[in-house]
């Protein structure tokens, strides 16, 4: 009591006391991740020794800095301790450093901190954790950002604690930091971007060609070639064409600009991916060309094809091997080539031929893969017979189907065509209208192919039976004269061989559609604008940023590598996929005529194809027209789990609709997605208006679904299903043999040889399976749906609990998938190839597993 009285009389007791607050910084030093930079570690230690340290300062959420406008008060500078002596690793190169702050007791909550790097090289800052902060206990900051030397920034870098704030809820002391951080991420829109830049900006796909010898049209920004935007690099235009951006040499592919925090850099697996892609483009392709220059470029039999899995391809060129060793870190070699450098390119046996080497050829498996294969997003309910084209008849003449009742009625298990239509038992795989506008041009290349329609019948046991295949060419006198079509049905003898060839042409159509549309355009390309807009317009403090950010990991990096090596003019896609140099142009045509944002929702997409119908009695009010449709059954479980989690989360932060309408960052984000990211579609009436919580829930669910589950469904089965190329040929090189010709005679004598001469050649086969093996591989540090790479991603207990509930639901889905795969009455789950459908099984280990839903389009 006397003490209190004394303080009252003397004004004592108000003085600020200082306490030591201890923290732990987790980071990865540059040399852990960089194979070639051995100097970085030494120079950083030298800088540290000379007093050039890493400095941190806390920022108060509660107390204003009188000298710094409305910004929060800054604490005293603190330094990372023991940089020189700390060599202990936590996991995969992570190091933990102590830091001690002088903490004034009236400082309040430390809502952010500033960091300055005075070392020679950059490091990856993972997190800062403070213990025993007066009045607040433990405070955690998630960073996951590269910190370059201070000379590369105009201000110190800022990081916020894991509390979540809508813009109007942000403490006034942090608001300026929040706004300034977004401004710096948007950049100025000028100049070439450098590796330390953090700028997210938009550009057209104008870097795919090399004029004048290998030009490609600019995709995006025109009515003729609309396209989603990609990340801007700011490279100069070519001298020959100011509309085309200059390209990096292939040897510098790994240096292509993406914002630094979007670049691969977790474990070796990410680097393995990048180096392996480079190896294919730079070394393996010319090596294979050299080997096959002196040998016939054909497989003579299916046994020949099997040898590439059982024996491997011998590349005896020692000079080539030496050049690979020089260009690829030694520790990568064994992983990429699986040998000591002599006989490489030996491939693992794809799952589709593991149990039975011939079941892939059956009609049952051909049909089953439309429901449970690589491209299960195309098959439709047939609503009219014969099928009609939607192409403009003035431009393309009569493109309607020439299939008649007599082609199929004998095969409908006693039903008439009308009855089969009425009972919803006829289905179509239709690659006619999407391909026909380009077919004449595609067939001027080495490709020789058709536009196809395949009709199928739903049998009583729930499986599909192929009935008929129609193969069409443009009229020789011009497109406007319509299509010239041939119809093929199952047969005996040589007619069975014709039927097998017809199925191969359907496979070629479907492979191209899968790779360019279902995979590249609908997941990789369409998601990138959301990645860019989210980083430009939503602060890391924003609840929607925290919701979506895990679903964007590595997407910009893999897409940039794709522009450099895969989808560019003369790149691996053009070499291995049938549309050749028209591949990307075709994907623009599909984006223009078929892509809408609301239809990316799985329920909407299934209804659009007639594969599902609203039914109040069915789970979630949706009934599948084919009950045993593995992609749709598993997919809907995953979709509704995502939607439920998103709704729980969004409703935590947005209590009323007005919260959505007055959220300045959210409205700017959605405006930019529509007007910039998908700017060629900005006037479409179907865009959600973003005025209600349900509109936000649906939009975020679509984004997460596309980035995670849809991408997994069309990507990670590539090697298991298509690694055996006769099952999913990607190119056709000669037309169907006609009766009374030498080609038809050869088909009668040696049907397998004709089949193999028709589909993908030996060189493209090896290139193609080299690529899809890499694309089907999970990295060892992958983060899967229902998981986060940090348990402290948010400070709000309710958000963490909602996510935990989602994680439990995901585990339940895994059990359900296992049970369905064990159910022998569900014949489409495994088929004659004895390959269970696991592409939407959420978790996986690393490698080629044919299962696992990573959070993002990360490969």
From Swiss-Prot:
The EC number(s) this enzyme carries: 1.13.11.58
Record-annotated PLAT domain positions: 21-161
Binding site for Fe cation: 519, 524, 711, 715, 859
The protein's assembly and partners: Monomer.
Protein name: Linoleate 9S-lipoxygenase 1
A Gene Ontology cellular-component term: plastid
UniProt source species: Arabidopsis thaliana
PANTHER family in alphabetical order: LIPOXYGENASE (PTHR11771)
CDD domains per UniProt: PLAT_LH2 (cd01751)
Native organism taxonomy: Eukaryota, Viridiplantae, Streptophyta, Embryophyta, Tracheophyta
């Amino acid at each position: 009591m006397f003490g209190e009285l004394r303080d009252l009389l003397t004004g004592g007791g108000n003085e600020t006391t200082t306490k030591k607050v201890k923290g732990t910084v987790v980071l990865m030093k540059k040399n852990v991740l960089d194979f070639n930079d051995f100097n970085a570690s030494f120079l950083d230690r030298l800088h540290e020794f000379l007093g050039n340290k890493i400095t941190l300062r806390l920022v108060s959420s509660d107390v204003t800095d009188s000298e710094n406008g409305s910004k929060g008060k800054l604490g005293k500078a603190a330094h990372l301790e023991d940089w020189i002596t700390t060599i202990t690793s936590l996991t995969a190169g992570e190091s933990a450093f102590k830091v001690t702050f002088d903490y004034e007791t009236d400082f309040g909550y430390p809502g952010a901190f500033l960091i300055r790097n005075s070392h020679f090289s950059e490091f990856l800052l993972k997190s800062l954790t403070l213990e025993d902060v007066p009045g607040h206990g433990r405070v955690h900051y998630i960073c996951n950002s590269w910190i370059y030397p201070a000379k590369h920034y105009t201000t110190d870098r800022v990081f916020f604690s894991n509390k979540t704030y809508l813009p109007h809820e942000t403490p006034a002391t942090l608001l300026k930091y929040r706004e300034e951080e977004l401004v710096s991420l948007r950049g100025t829109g000028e100049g070439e971007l450098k590796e330390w830049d953090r700028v997210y900006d938009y550009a057209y796909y104008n870097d795919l060609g090399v004029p004048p010898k290998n030009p490609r049209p600019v995709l995006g920004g025109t009515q003729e070639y609309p396209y989603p935007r990609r990340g801007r690099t700011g490279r100069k235009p070519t001298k020959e064409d100011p509309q085309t951006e200059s390209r990096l040499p292939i040897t510098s592919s790994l240096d292509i600009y993406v914002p630094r925090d979007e670049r691969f850099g977790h474990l070796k697996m990410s680097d393995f991916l990048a180096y392996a892609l480079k190896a294919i483009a730079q070394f393996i392709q010319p090596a294979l060309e050299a080997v096959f220059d002196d040998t016939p470029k054909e497989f003579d039999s299916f046994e020949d094809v099997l040898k590439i899995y059982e024996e491997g391809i011998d590349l005896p060129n020692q000079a080539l091997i030496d050049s690979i060793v020089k260009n690829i870190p030694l520790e990568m070699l064994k992983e990429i080539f699986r040998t000591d450098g002599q006989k490489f390119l030996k491939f693992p046996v794809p799952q589709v031929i593991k149990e039975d080497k011939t079941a892939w050829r059956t009609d049952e498996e051909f049909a089953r893969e439309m429901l449970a294969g690589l491209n299960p997003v195309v098959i439709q309910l047939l609503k009219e017979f014969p099928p009609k084209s939607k192409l403009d008849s003035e431009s393309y003449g009569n493109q309607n189907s020439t299939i008649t009742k007599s082609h199929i009625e004998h095969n409908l298990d006693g039903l008439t065509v009308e009855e089969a239509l009425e009972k919803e038992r006829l289905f179509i795989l239709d690659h006619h209208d999407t391909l026909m506008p380009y077919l004449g041009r595609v067939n001027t290349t080495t490709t020789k192919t058709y536009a196809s329609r395949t009709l199928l019948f739903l049998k009583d046991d729930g499986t599909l039976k192929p009935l008929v295949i129609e193969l069409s060419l443009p009229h020789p006198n011009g497109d406007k004269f319509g299509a010239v079509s041939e119809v093929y049905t199952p047969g005996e003898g040589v007619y069975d061989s014709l039927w097998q060839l017809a199925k191969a042409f359907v496979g070629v159509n479907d492979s191209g559609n899968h790779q360019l549309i279902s995979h590249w355009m609908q997941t990789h390309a369409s998601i990138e604008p959301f990645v860019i807009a989210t980083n430009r317009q939503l602060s890391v403090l924003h609840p929607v940023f925290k919701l979506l950010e895990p679903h964007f990991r590595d997407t910009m990096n893999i897409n940039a590598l794709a522009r450099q090596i895969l989808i560019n003019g003369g790149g691996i896609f053009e070499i291995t996929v049938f549309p050749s140099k028209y591949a990307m142009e075709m994907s623009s045509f599909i984006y223009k005529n078929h892509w809408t944002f609301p239809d990316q929702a799985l329920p909407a997409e299934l209804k659009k194809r007639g594969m599902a119908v609203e039914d109040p009695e069915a789970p979630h009010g949706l009934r599948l027209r084919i009950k045993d449709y593995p992609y749709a059954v598993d997919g809907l479980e995953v979709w509704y789990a995502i939607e439920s989690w998103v709704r729980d989360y969004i409703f935590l932060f947005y209590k009323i609709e007005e919260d959505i309408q007055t959220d300045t960052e959210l409205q700017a984000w959605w405006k930019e997605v529509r007007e910039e990211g998908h700017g060629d579609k900005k006037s479409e009436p179907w865009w959600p208006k973003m005025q209600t919580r349900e509109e936000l829930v649906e939009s975020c669910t679509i984004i997460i679904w596309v980035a995670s589950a849809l991408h997994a469904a069309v990507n990670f089965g590539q090697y298991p299903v298509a690694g055996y190329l006769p099952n999913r040929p990607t190119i056709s090189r000669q037309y169907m043999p006609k009766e009374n010709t030498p080609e038809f005679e050869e088909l009668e004598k040696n049907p397998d040889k004709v089949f193999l001469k028709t589909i993908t050649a030996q060189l493209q086969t090896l290139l193609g399976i080299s690529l899809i093996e890499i694309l089907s591989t999970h990295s060892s540090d992958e983060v899967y749906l229902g998981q986060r790479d940090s348990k402290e991603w948010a400070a709000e207990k309710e958000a963490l609990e909602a996510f935990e509930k989602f994680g439990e639901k995901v585990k339940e889905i895994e059990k359900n998938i296992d049970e369905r795969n064990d159910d022998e009455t569900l014949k489409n789950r495994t088929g004659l190839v004895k390959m269970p459908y696991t592409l939407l099984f959420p978790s996986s280990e690393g490698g080629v597993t044919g299962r696992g839903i990573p959070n993002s389009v990360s490969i």
